[in-house]
Amino acid sequence: MPLLKLVFLGTGGAVPRSDRTLPAIYLEDWLGHRFLLDAGEGAQYRLLQIGVSPASLTAVAITHQHEDHTLGLPGLVITSRFLGGRTAVLAPRSMHKALEALGVEVMDSYGGDRLRVSCVEVCHTVDACGWLFQWDVGYKLDLSKAAGLPRWALTSLIRGSPVEVGGRLIKPEDVAEPGHKRLRRLLYTGDTAPCPEMWRKVGEVDVLIHEATFADDVEPQKAHEEGHSTVADAVEAAKALNAGVLILTHVSSRYPDKRRHRELAASVKPPPHVYVPEDFDTVLVRL
């Protein structure tokens, strides 16, 4: 079953609170990939608190150079090295030279088992990547069309490979359920103002993790000039991207709690499903 596990290790931004630390999200998929999305100060300790070794990460995906998203990286890299690992880091190209000095493997995209991760340019005050995850979940077969096919053939068809049975070539599309969507997508924006050009380039996503630095007490124009978004901006992005799940994070320390963010998110009509997690909350998403 295509299932994502997201653990929100740090849901604040810029300045931490005692109960809201700096940006870091642990993502684990059903294929065994393990990613850390941004590495705010103390990220490795928070990973250890949920039982994840820094050396076990597939990669760390950094959105941009600001310190609240990067100060946890050096310690994590050193710990991983002591444990026999070598950290791979996805980052904007403007950061590559500095990261290479840390002795890490620097990449601007990732291609693994049925997963691709790529940078999409967002609208921040510095060079910044949103990270687009795209999984190939295979085909869901129409059992009436696939009746009588041997098990080995079904396995190959689900994985997207054509088969020859009894002298007949069968393509996955021939026996798939109509309208089945083979690719599933998650976008993590990092810091961004509303970014219609990015929305158009990306198209659609299933899950959107979007910053919501401000609720509704800051003039939108001021938020945008600082390269950030309000709750309403994040909702607009989710609608533009046709996201089924919207998760709001990077909440400013000016808010003692997230009550107003939740009230605003709850007023969204029509949904997507909207979550405003606290530090260490886990969200499971079935793709």
From Swiss-Prot:
The keyword Metal-binding applies. Zn(2+) 1 binds at residues 64, 66, 124, 191. Zn(2+) 2 binds at residues 68-69, 191, 250. The active site is at residue 68. Its cofactor is Zn(2+). InterPro entries: Metallo-B-lactamas, RibonucZ/Hydroxyglut_hydro, RNase_Z/BN. Disulfide bonds: none annotated. It catalyses: Endonucleolytic cleavage of RNA, removing extra 3' nucleotides from tRNA precursor, generating 3' termini of tRNAs. A 3'-hydroxy group is left at the tRNA terminus and a 5'-phosphoryl group is left at the trailer molecule. It holds the Pfam family Lactamase_B_2. GO terms for molecular function: 3'-tRNA processing endoribonuclease activity; zinc ion binding. Keywords: Endonuclease, Hydrolase, Metal-binding, Nuclease, tRNA processing, Zinc. Binds 2 Zn(2+) ions. Its EC number is 3.1.26.11. SUPFAM superfamilies: Metallo-hydrolase/oxidoreductase. The keyword Nuclease applies. It comes from the Archaea. It is an enzyme of class 3 (hydrolase). Homodimer. Belongs to the RNase Z family. PANTHER family: ZINC PHOSPHODIESTERASE ELAC PROTEIN 1. Zinc phosphodiesterase, which displays some tRNA 3'-processing endonuclease activity. Probably involved in tRNA maturation, by removing a 3'-trailer from precursor tRNA. This is Ribonuclease Z. It comes from Pyrobaculum neutrophilum (strain DSM 2338 / JCM 9278 / NBRC 100436 / V24Sta).
